[in-house]
């Protein structure tokens, strides 16, 4: 695998759009789920037959979620808080108190369409896994790089993927990404869910390229 160091989800999404979606296929509106509707929240704990869960932390969860939402085979996404010791934290508490949580993205996917390895490949591309407790200007433990595995198979895949990345020489500095068992995932407030989509952020950027 060739590791292209986009280092942030926005760069990845813009390049994906400019390349015509050759890396991963863009989904139609009909395929995208609204994670915050009442009927859909259950899917993030109990996906149902034929679906699997993945959980990642890679900095501010807004852009990370949007990157995973573009992948064919991803059925639903939600942002939340994981890896901490504080029950049902709010965004303000995660940002200002030592709750130990990371801003995380829960991904529900169909392994018949997209593999967990593909999700790992995207994860490495959309952030800098060599910076501890920060991504770009965002500094704090909540912005740390983490792969939360849901099974022994995911753990093995994550460790192998990390080793492959380290051997590739793509990064000069050591990879500091944590690979840990999944812990309680607390859904973030509604206004954080699909933030880029709600704000039309990417659409405005893409329109500017056409001018």
From Swiss-Prot:
Enzyme superclass (EC): oxidoreductase
Catalytic activity: L-methionyl-[protein] + [thioredoxin]-disulfide + H2O = L-methionyl-(S)-S-oxide-[protein] + [thioredoxin]-dithiol; [thioredoxin]-disulfide + L-methionine + H2O = L-methionine (S)-S-oxide + [thioredoxin]-dithiol
Coiled coil: none
InterPro entries from the UniProt entry: Met_Sox_Rdtase_MsrA_dom, Met_Sox_Rdtase_MsrA_sf
Location of the active site: 60
GO molecular function: L-methionine:thioredoxin-disulfide S-oxidoreductase activity; peptide-methionine (S)-S-oxide reductase activity
Keywords noted in UniProt: Oxidoreductase
Pfam families to which the protein is assigned, alphabetical: PMSR
A Gene Ontology BP annotation from the UniProt entry: protein modification process
EC identifiers of the protein: 1.8.4.11
Function of the molecule: Has an important function as a repair enzyme for proteins that have been inactivated by oxidation. Catalyzes the reversible oxidation-reduction of methionine sulfoxide in proteins to methionine.
Family label: Belongs to the MsrA Met sulfoxide reductase family.
HAMAP family: MsrA
Protein name: Peptide methionine sulfoxide reductase MsrA
Organism of origin: Methanosarcina mazei (strain ATCC BAA-159 / DSM 3647 / Goe1 / Go1 / JCM 11833 / OCM 88)
């Amino acid at each position: 695998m060739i590791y292209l160091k986009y280092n942030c989800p926005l760069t990845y999404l813009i390049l994906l759009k400019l390349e015509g979606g050759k890396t991963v296929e863009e989904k139609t509106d009909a395929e995208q789920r609204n994670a915050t509707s009442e009927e859909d929240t259950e899917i993030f704990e109990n996906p149902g037959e034929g679906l699997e869960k993945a959980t990642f932390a890679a900095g501010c969860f807004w852009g990370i979620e949007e990157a995973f939402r573009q992948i064919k085979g991803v059925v639903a996404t939600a942002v939340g808080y994981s890896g901490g010791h504080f029950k049902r934290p709010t965004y303000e508490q995660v940002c200002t108190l030592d709750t130990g949580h990371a801003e995380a993205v829960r991904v529900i996917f169909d392994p018949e369409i997209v593999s967990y390895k593909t999700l790992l490949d995207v994860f490495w591309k959309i952030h800098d896994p060599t910076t501890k407790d920060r991504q770009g200007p965002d500094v704090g433990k909540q912005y740390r790089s983490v792969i939360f595995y849901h099974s022994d198979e995911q753990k093995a895949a994550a460790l192998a993927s990390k080793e492959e990345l380290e051997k590739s020489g793509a990064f000069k500095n050591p990879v500091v990404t944590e690979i840990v068992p999944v812990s309680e995932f607390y859904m973030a407030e509604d206004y954080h869910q699909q933030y880029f989509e709600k704000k039309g952020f990417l659409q405005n950027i893409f329109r500017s390229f056409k001018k």
